[in-house]
Amino acid sequence: MEISLLNIIACPLCQGQLLLQEQELVCQIDALAYPVRTNIPVLLVSEARNILVK
C-alpha cells in the first residue's frame, strides 16, 4: 500500500486517522483494524477486527 494514501483515507466509522501496522490500518479511536489485501485497504466496518484485548 502506498504510504501517501494515509494522508487521504480515514476511518469509515469515525473519520479519524488510520495508522499502518503490518498488513492492517488501525483506528485507535474505535479500536478497529482494517485489513490490507494485495496492497488494497478494505475499509468496511464489517471486515474490521476489534483490537481490544478481552
Swiss-Prot record:
A Pfam family reported for this protein in Swiss-Prot or TrEMBL: Trm112p
Organism annotation: Baumannia cicadellinicola subsp. Homalodisca coagulata
Annotated signal sequence range: none
UniProt cross-references to SUPFAM superfamilies, sorted A to Z: Trm112p-like (SSF158997)
Superkingdom of the organism of origin: Bacteria
Similarity remark: Belongs to the UPF0434 family.
Name by which UniProt lists this protein: UPF0434 protein BCI_0256
InterPro entries named in the record: Trm112-like (IPR005651)
